[in-house]
From Swiss-Prot:
N-acetylserine PTM positions: S2
Phosphoserine: residues bearing it: S19, S326
UniProt protein name: Phosphatidylinositol 5-phosphate 4-kinase type-2 beta
Gene designation: Pip4k2b
Species whose genome carries this gene: Rattus norvegicus (Rat)
Residues reported in the UniProt entry to bind ATP: R202, N203, V204, K214
Annotated GTP binding sites: N203, V204, K214, D369
């Protein structure tokens, strides 16, 4: 089962030292007739399928309340001898959306307009991420970096069905104010007889603010260091021991710490009730001063390049990059933010460092990987690790109640 795969379900804007395109002009070709052009057939089918299902849903009235059958429902379409747009789409494919009414309701509760969601997934091809789970889990972001698309296993799909009703009820009760993953859609794509399952969530990290350092924290210290291979990446995912050895702290202030831990405790208690464990707190850190310095350097280079190309007359325009065309209502009216500023309705997991902190930072924090039930396989792994490391060791495969308690305690200690 895929439950042994730990992975990062957020994709950051890479540090500018690695990718110097933040303020360069980006050109996204947006045709009136969508061509769903992507680098591989599976992504073209995803774009086509989401476009199709959202269009179909727009003709279905929003019910007063969801019914039990909505949590078992699906819509599927089989396309044969597809001649239109054959240079981009395979001639035969199948697309299935799970629980369409439920996920539409969840998108609404998370403040995501269906038109915005459709545009983000279909306007330009999703982007591959270098984040990858140990079992080959694949991550992509939508072109505007608002949503993460993750491949999952059929077991994960089954587990989603198991928890979806209670998850939805929890989201209703907390009014969408949660650190849990925001599940927005779940699909099965069949191309050349191969089935691929995908789940779409809101990106934990910002589409705009660069993440300079990130951590996957479980509250366990056994075998919880980033590998040398991981550390060689432009933006490695560090782990618990790396965090502790660096003496890292998240300096948010007393009030923000109290509010965050209350929300975390409520979310984690819910996961323990569902017998779910092995989740992580994903943490991204945006260094405001470093970002300003990188921005200035890139703007200077861009200005020099553009002024060389355009002549002296273009000088005033050279200082400003052009953001990509943006989906529907969320970004119809551009808003200009100062350094380290963000829109809390978009960057819902963001939190500023306290005014007294030695460095001005923005933290992005959310719970990820919640589709791991405490089943027989986990119990066996726990027994094996206990034999190897001893009963007192902080291993990650404890039971859900122990896991949640240890998780809360660890997170309480790293916030200040």
């Amino acid at each position: 089962m895929s439950s042994n795969c730990t992975s990062t379900t957020a994709v950051a804007v890479a540090p500018l030292s690695a990718s110097k395109t933040k303020t360069k002009k980006k050109h996204f070709v947006c045709q009136k007739v969508k061509l769903f052009r992507a680098s591989e057939p599976i992504l073209s089918v995803l774009m086509w399928g989401v476009n199709h299902t959202i269009n179909e849903l727009s003709n279905v009235p929003v019910p007063v309340m969801l019914m039990p059958d909505d949590f078992k429902a699906y819509s599927k379409i089989k396309v044969d001898n597809h001649l239109f747009n054959k240079e981009n789409l395979p001639s035969r494919f199948k697309f299935k959306e799970y629980c369409p009414m439920v996920f539409r309701n969840l998108r609404e509760r998370f403040g995501i307009d269906d038109q915005d969601y459709q545009n983000s997934v279909t306007r330009s091809a999703p982007i591959n991420s270098d984040s990858q789970g140990r079992c080959g889990t694949r991550f992509l972001t939508t072109y505007d970096r608002r949503f993460v698309i993750k491949t999952v296993s059929s077991e994960d799909v089954a587990e989603m069905h198991n928890i979806l009703k209670k998850y939805h009820q929890f989201i209703v009760e907390c009014h969408g104010n949660t650190l849990l993953p925001q599940f927005l859609g779940m699909y099965r794509l069949t191309v050349d007889g191969v089935e691929t399952y995908m789940v779409v969530t809101r990106n934990v990290f910002s589409h705009r603010l660069t993440v300079h350092r990130k951590y996957d924290l479980k509250g366990s210290t056994v075998a919880r260091e980033a590998s040398d291979k991981e550390k060689a990446k432009d933006l490695p995912t560090f782990k618990d021991n790396d965090f502790l050895n660096e003496g890292q702290k998240l300096r948010v202030g007393e009030e923000s710490k109290k509010n965050f831990l209350e929300k975390l405790k409520r979310d984690v208690e819910f996961l323990a009730q569902l017998k779910i464990m092995d989740y992580s707190l994903l943490v991204g850190i945006h260094d405001v001063d470093r970002a300003e310095q990188e921005e200035t350097e890139v703007e200077d280079r861009a200005e020099e390049e553009e002024c060389e190309n355009d002549g002296v007359g273009g000088g005033l325009l050279c200082s400003y990059g052009t953001p990509p065309d943006s989906p529907g209502n969320l970004l119809s009216f551009p808003r200009f933010f100062g350094p380290g500023e963000f829109d809390p309705s978009v960057d819902v997991y963001a939190m500023k460092s306290h005014e007294s902190a030695p460095k001005k930072e923005v933290y992005f924090m959310a719970i990820i990987d919640i589709l791991t039930p405490y089943d027989a396989k986990k119990k066996a792994a726990h027994a094996a690790k206990t034999v190897k490391h001893g009963a007192g060791a902080e291993i990650s495969t404890v039971n859900p109640e122990q896991y949640s308690k240890r998780f809360n305690e660890f997170m309480s200690n790293i916030l200040t």
